[in-house]
Amino acid sequence: MGYIRRPAYYKAFRCIGSDCTENCCIGWEIDVDEDSLAYYETVPGDFGERLRASIAPADAQTGESAHFRLDAEERCPLLNDCNLCEVLLHLGEDKMAQICTDHPRYYEWFSDGREDGLGLCCEAAAELILAQTGAPAFDVTEADGVSETGTEAETELENVLFSMRDALFWLACEDAPFDDKADRLYRTAKAQQEQYDDLLFPFPEDEDADETDEDTASWSQAFWRESTLTSLLELLLGFEINKDDWRTLLTGAKARLPEIIARRNDFLQAYQGKRHEYDNLLTYFLYRHFMKALGDDAVQDKVQLALVSTAVIQLLDVYEWLAKGEVTHWAQICICKAYSREIEYNEDNTEQLAAFSVLDEME
């Protein structure tokens, strides 16, 4: 019998449906899984005809999956004027495509279990993620449907990474200024990468290896330099952008970088009572992305992704504060979900951010 691990807030999630300002049926190409597609072929009547006409078939040449055709306004054709799903209304929730049932939930499978989470791109999920206080808490349950399929070696390697991630969680939530915390996380990640490499490739240690500049450099000082932030924002602006509000946010921040850097400490002092939100974001990004190191052995890069992601959101918070005089709770949710929507659901984007070398920008 395997396990399922979930953040403690997971069970509190409820889709807010038509009250959502960022409907997940608008602006996203929604794939239709094979089981749902087979069922939709059997639906009778006018609705069945309209349902099938709304689906673009899979294309073997391009590798594109079957998906709902978006209309001219990039809405799912089965989203009615009240922003309610007609599949749900006509056929029931259990007949929705798998991705529609799951979103914003995501799943990561391991040799003897599974981890579930909620994506930050959803405003209802972002509300829960930002609201947490204290150390991260998780619910772990045994599950009949999750079998133990891995070898002993695979499980051992996973447990090493789980232990490393637990140490990072602790650092992310300790009572310390954000920059000090980021520097500790970066140094810890560098040490963890070396430990992980030694585990995979147990060559004799070079006792004469000198300490490098990177070992003693401050990640935060390097990140909050104008040259680093300019390079980073240019990278983000070069990604495929889904919605214009994201481009507007990035270009606005880029135009005011000197002021953002100069006033950042004032912002952090003014919003000291919400410092835990950045702890929660660090924890969220570590939980969601760190264990992907099983696939590429890039432990340090996964921590880099969490650091850059959280710091970019903070950068945009400072810009919002300068532009509007405050960062409302709703504005914070909007910034978080925009970042997640634009970055986390494109593997090329996350890989490039994970590989973005902050310390190299100092050279």
Spans of model-derived segments:
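Immediate flanking context of iron-sulfur cluster ligation sites
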Residues: 2-20, 55-97, 114
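Long, low-complexity, compositionally biased intrinsically disordered regions
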Residues: 2-22, 111, 124-126, 130, ...
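Short runs of predominantly hydrophobic/aromatic residues within well-ordered alpha helices
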Residues: 17, 21, 161, 165, ...
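General secretory precursor processing signal
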Residues: 18, 23, 27-28, 79, ...
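A structured, charge-rich N-terminal accessory region that forms the first stable segment of a protein
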Residues: 22, 26-59
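Short glycine-rich, low-complexity/disordered patches
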Residues: 51-67, 180-185, 326-329
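Internal, well-ordered alpha/beta segment that forms a basic, Gly-enriched binding/recognition surface
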Residues: 83, 90-183
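Hydrophobic, aromatic-lined core segments that form the binding pocket/scaffold
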Residues: 175-363
